[in-house]
């Protein structure tokens, strides 16, 4: 399906005006802080950057004192942030503009539904499609929450710029407000003084739900149903979008995730969504002032209204208001019942005195209701379904007496939200490394006198033993009297908490447990043993789905055999049957890329999906994929629409899950317009891939796949030859990148490595990619690509034409190359050379020459296959964006290099070390997808 891509703006000059205005105000704020003489140096640096005089730039920055570095770092870190805001505002305007004129754009939902409506299974497809963005707290989100709140205010003001130009909004006041917030942000710390805790990550992510996601998901779902209805397809209870969450449940490599953080995550989520419902009920209460003297109501509505404690004479004839009052009181009590307390009033008090993590979400309405309570026993909702039934009772009364139009709007949105979010908001995933599960199971088996050294058993022996425990003995292995290691106690506690939360908030609060580094069937049975210990799994059913994560090249290659064996067991089939016949498999993009390079990773993942989909079909099971993507191309990132539509045909049955990480969350969901558009695109792309076969000739696709096998083999060899076989590469990475400084940056609760780093394989994929972004090589997104294509073309001169055909006709290959094109455009080998000079020895510095040669070769090969003269020819919007943003954050690289030099030569006092973190922050902001 072909769609026009969104342009920068219907008015091409407006974004230039906005950026100019924001820069002017930043200049004013900076000059006010430091004076005209010092600001002259910033103006000189700006001039040098805009004329690409990098020799002069390097000399000027080297001459700056440490004190002068402070303001230069801050200025050039904030400027890209303001440019981002302008772009976001402009994109939102363009989306609304095209929607208002009924124009098409990439990912437009109405266009997708128009197409799918002609499909023979249209209703089934639209009823069951489910896209699940899963928000994670991987350490790539470098912005402080305070800064995000300030940028949100600037964003809201900039949205009014066109109205200011048209004279609709008072220019003087608007300008003063914008000046004030830019002045504040210039004087606000943009980096964290202390490392985030898990509880901070939880509350930070909740801000996106409050700010944009709840309303965007609800609105989009309602629009989805309405568009289908226009095509004569009446959907019963579609959930095209539901949300997922890793924060609080992902303990792989993060010792700070515990049973307490899991409970906190669930409780805060519940409070956020229930508070949203309370706010919506407030709106309904204010607006639904229908008098019984002027309209009829159903007997059921009267019964509901009469239970209200609102005895005001002014509302005795307003049954709808009284009904909403009663519903609201029950909902408030439901919220309070989540906290421990004896009497209703004590619960309110504990609510008000609770920690700021929870208290920030409780609105003043609760205190008001608390002061009016007269009874000791207040009703509460046991389930979200009970709450929904009361709302439907109101709806039915309105419809019964001809008030259909009043159902639309707030009431319909509220009912829709309850359907989507329940009382839990987002499903929390649990995740742990397979080695931890094995250690816990080994301890349990030894404690129960079953086997002394479980880990020494063969894979076959392990499976036989675990299968026997899972099918033949309903008793648990653990005993309350038996001593347990700290690790086992911690793991059992988090599983027990998961069960309690499912009992309290509903099954959907926790549905999956992911096993990192899944390498065998026994890895999955070991998790089952742990789940059995707390009653979450037995011989007939599983209340939590076991999700293997295949992440290295080797594990992905072995995934077919592992899953074939796993699905062979009748026990496993019973578990899957209780999950509506779905078996989820998570695919790791980050580790596979670090393991084998971009081409090898991408192709191995593609083949694995094909093979695993076939296994599912052979067993009558729906295999669904969870894509563990990051922000960068090196971690599976890139444009969302193309990423989804380039998946193998048939790999998306009706459900797809994908991680949204770090700064990508802010970029995609920082405001309601952006959230709506990006979520709309995810749904459209998933449906498009489900119904549209891009290549209809099976022989052609087989030929393309055979070609890729040969190309990837060469790419993998070239990549591993440098990364794992070159004796100087390790030192080059650690000396010619800011990896040490990135690892100390307070950007997440998770450590940068699972253990002390002595080799590349021990480093987490995220700081690995983040550091290559900082030194502007973007290594994980392209290295090995050029050599592989050159080798293939040298075998036969006709092979270039073959690659060009693959690029034109095969979405997977097109997306692969387009991502490399984008990454190359953001790299800068002149800057990378300056980082290389940081390395101590000539042998280590010479690694850069190997990288540079491959970079040039990759660029030449990509342009030849795309048949383009320049990079980004098919992405003019990004090209324009980089044109006006690159000069500014290129400055930050030179500042960072100089600061690292001073730090490593002991010329930078401890007080100034955080300047390096400011530059890291600014470069990540400018790139927009840093990790």
Swiss-Prot record:
SUPFAM superfamilies recorded: Phosphoenolpyruvate/pyruvate domain
Enzyme class, UniProt record, top EC level: lyase
TM segment ranges: none
Record keyword Kinase present: no
Protein keywords: Carbon dioxide fixation, Lyase, Magnesium
Cited Gene3D superfamilies: Phosphoenolpyruvate/pyruvate domain
EC number from the UniProt entry: 4.1.1.31
Reactions catalysed: oxaloacetate + phosphate = phosphoenolpyruvate + hydrogencarbonate
Cofactor field: Mg(2+)
One of the Pfam families matching this protein, by short name: PEPcase
GO MF, any single term: phosphoenolpyruvate carboxylase activity
Cellular component per GO, a single term: cytosol
Family per record: Belongs to the PEPCase type 1 family.
Stated name of the protein: Phosphoenolpyruvate carboxylase
Lineage: Bacteria, Bacillati, Bacillota, Bacilli, Lactobacillales
Name of the encoding gene: ppc
């Amino acid at each position: 399906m072909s769609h026009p891509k969104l342009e920068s703006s219907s008015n091409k000059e407006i974004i230039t005006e906005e950026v100019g205005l924001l820069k002017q105000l930043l200049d004013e704020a900076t000059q006010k802080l430091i004076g005209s003489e010092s600001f002259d140096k910033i103006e000189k640096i700006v001039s040098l950057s805009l004329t690409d005089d990098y020799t002069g730039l390097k000399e000027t920055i080297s001459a700056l004192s440490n004190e002068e570095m402070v303001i230069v770092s801050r200025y050039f870190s904030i400027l890209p942030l303001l440019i981002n805001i302008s772009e976001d505002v402009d994109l939102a305007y363009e989306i609304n503009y095209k929607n208002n004129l009924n124009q098409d754009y990439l990912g437009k939902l109405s266009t997708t539904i128009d197409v799918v409506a002609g499909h023979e299974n249209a209703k089934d497809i639209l009823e069951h499609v489910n896209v699940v963005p899963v928000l994670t707290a991987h350490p790539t989100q470098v912005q402080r929450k305070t800064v995000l709140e300030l940028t949100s205010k600037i964003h809201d003001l900039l949205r009014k710029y066109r109205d200011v130009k048209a004279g609709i909004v008072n220019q003087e006041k608007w300008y003063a407000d914008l000046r004030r917030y830019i002045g504040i942000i210039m004087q606000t710390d943009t980096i964290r003084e202390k490392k985030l805790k898990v509880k901070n990550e939880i509350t930070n992510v909740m801000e996106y739900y409050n700010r944009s996601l709840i309303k965007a998901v609800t609105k989009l779902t309602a629009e989805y149903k309405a568009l289908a209805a226009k095509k004569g397809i009446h959907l019963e209870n579609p959930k095209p979008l539901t949300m997922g969450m890793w924060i609080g449940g992902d303990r792989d490599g993060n010792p700070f995730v515990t049973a307490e953080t899991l409970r906190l995550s669930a409780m805060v989520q519940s409070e956020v969504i229930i508070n949203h419902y309370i706010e919506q009920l407030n709106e309904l209460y204010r607006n639904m002032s229908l008098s019984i003297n002027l309209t009829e109501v159903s007997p059921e509505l009267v019964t509901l209204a009469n239970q209200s404690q609102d005895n005001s004479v002014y509302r005795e004839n307003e049954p709808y208001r009284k009904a909403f009052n009663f519903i609201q009181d029950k909902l408030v009590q439901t919220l309070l019942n989540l906290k421990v307390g004896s009497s209703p009033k004590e619960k309110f008090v504990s609510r008000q005195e609770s920690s700021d993590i929870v208290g920030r979400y409780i609105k003043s309405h609760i205190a008001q209701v608390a002061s009016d309570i007269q009874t000791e026993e207040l009703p509460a909702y046991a389930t979200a379904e009970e709450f929904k039934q009361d709302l439907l009772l109101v709806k039915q009364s309105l419809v019964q007496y001809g008030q259909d139009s009043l159902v639309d709007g707030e009431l319909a949105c509220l009912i829709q939200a309850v359907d989507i979010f329940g009382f839990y908001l987002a499903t929390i995933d649990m995740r742990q490394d397979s080695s931890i599960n094995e250690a816990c199971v080994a301890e349990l088996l030894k404690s129960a006198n079953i086997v002394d050294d479980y880990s020494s058993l063969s894979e076959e022996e392990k499976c036989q033993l675990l299968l026997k425990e899972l099918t033949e003995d309903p008793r648990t292995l653990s005993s309350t009297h038996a001593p347990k290691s700290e690790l086992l106690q911690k793991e059992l506690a988090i599983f027990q908490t998961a069960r309690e939360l499912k009992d309290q908030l509903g099954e959907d609060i926790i549905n999956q447990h992911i096993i990192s580094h899944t390498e065998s069937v026994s890895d999955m049975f070991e998790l089952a043993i742990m789940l059995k210990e707390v009653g979450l799994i037995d011989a007939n059913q599983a209340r939590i789905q076991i999700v293997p994560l295949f992440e290295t090249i080797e594990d992905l290659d072995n995934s077919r055999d592992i899953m074939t064996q796993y699905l062979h067991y009748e026990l496993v089939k019973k578990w899957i049957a209780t999950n509506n016949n779905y078996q989820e498999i998570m695919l790791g993009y980050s580790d596979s890329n670090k393991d084998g390079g971009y081409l090898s990773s991408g192709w191995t993942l593609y083949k694995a999906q094909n093979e695993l989909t076939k296994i599912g079909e052979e067993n009558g099971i729906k295999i669904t994929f969870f894509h563990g993507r990051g922000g960068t191309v090196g971690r599976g990132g890139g444009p969302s629409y193309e990423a989804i539509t380039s998946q193998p045909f048939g790999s998306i049955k009706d459900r797809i899950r994908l991680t949204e990480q770090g700064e990508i969350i802010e970029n995609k969901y920082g405001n309601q317009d952006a959230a709506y558009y990006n979520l709309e695109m995810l749904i459209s792309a998933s449906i498009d891939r489900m119904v549209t076969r891009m290549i209809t000739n099976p022989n052609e696709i087989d030929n393309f796949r055979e070609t890729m096998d040969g190309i990837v083999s060469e790419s993998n060899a070239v990549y591993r030859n440098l990364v794992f076989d070159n004796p100087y590469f390790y030192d080059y990475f650690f000396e010619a990148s800011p990896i040490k400084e990135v690892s100390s940056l307070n950007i997440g609760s998770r450590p940068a490595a699972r253990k002390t780093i002595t080799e590349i394989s021990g480093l987490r994929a995220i700081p690995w990619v983040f550091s290559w972004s900082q030194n502007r090589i973007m290594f994980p997104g392209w290295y090995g690509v050029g050599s592989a294509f050159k080798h293939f073309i040298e075998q036969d001169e006709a092979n270039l034409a073959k690659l060009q055909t693959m690029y034109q006709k095969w979405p997977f290959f097109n997306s692969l190359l387009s991502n490399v094109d984008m990454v190359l455009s953001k790299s800068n080998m002149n800057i990378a050379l300056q980082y290389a000079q940081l390395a101590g020895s000539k042998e280590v510095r010479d690694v850069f020459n190997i990288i540079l040669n491959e970079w040039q070769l990759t660029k030449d090969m990509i342009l030849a296959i795309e048949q383009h003269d320049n990079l980004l020819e098919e992405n003019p919007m990004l090209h324009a964006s980089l044109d006006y943003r690159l000069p500014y954050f290129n400055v930050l690289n030179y500042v960072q290099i100089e600061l690292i030099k001073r730090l490593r030569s002991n010329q930078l006092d401890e007080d100034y070390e955080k300047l390096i973190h400011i530059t890291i922050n600014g470069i990540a902001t400018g790139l927009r997808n840093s990790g």
